[in-house]
Amino acid sequence: MDKIRTVSDTKRDFYNHHTRPINSIYRRFIEELLVEMHLLCVNIDFRYDPIYALGVVASFQQFMQGYRPEEDKNSIFSALCQAVGGDGEKYRHEAQTLLNQVKGMSVSDLIAMGNSARTGEPGEGMLYNTLQAIAKNPQFKYSRLFAIGLYTMVMEIDADLLKEQDKRNETFSQLCNGLNLSSDKLQKDLDLYRSNVDKMGQLLAVIEDALEAERKKREKAKQEVATTPEDSPAN
């Protein structure tokens, strides 16, 4: 019997793959995402799927905005996926494939596809196959990251719809019905996600203002040095 990996094992693997220091402002998010992915991957009912992958990618992109140095982000994402036995390129490729498939669709089309997948009607493509596998799996392990993936697909189709609470709730209620999922937990997770996105946006604005103020301060100091007359030489 294989030994179940611990959170410590996963964290150690992560820091073995990404060896550079992590910006302190973002460290908590990265470690919380890592733990969340770990707990899912060691759950006997969890099965990786492209909607979950999209949730991981979208969450990372959303909450890593403004990270410096920018070039470290790819290494961090790859390390997150590798630490739980995954492949960052696969996550990104399948996430983008889903977004490409929903382009040109309406939200009604997406809901109808979910209903067709549940009833076993013929269909094709990664999105349809994923929806059908979920709808047909009574042991499907729901996760917050799956909810974010579903949310990201709807955003790709109609971002304005998500701004109206009644329409948003009705949309996800219908999607959950098609997938044989309870919508209550999903909608609570999405409300929290939206709130955290807003808070992150506010934090980034504060950081940018502080950086701009510091830049202006340095520029002013340089100008003052440049315009200060040199002392006249002593006779």
Swiss-Prot record:
The lineage of its organism: Bacteria, Bacillati, Cyanobacteriota, Cyanophyceae, Oscillatoriophycideae. The keyword Coiled coil applies. PANTHER family: PROTEIN THYLAKOID FORMATION 1, CHLOROPLASTIC. May be involved in photosynthetic membrane biogenesis. HAMAP family: Thf1 (MF_01843). It comes from Rippkaea orientalis (strain PCC 8801 / RF-1) (Cyanothece sp. (strain PCC 8801)). One of its GO terms (biological process) is photosystem II assembly. InterPro entries: Thf1 (IPR017499). Belongs to the THF1 family. This is Protein Thf1.
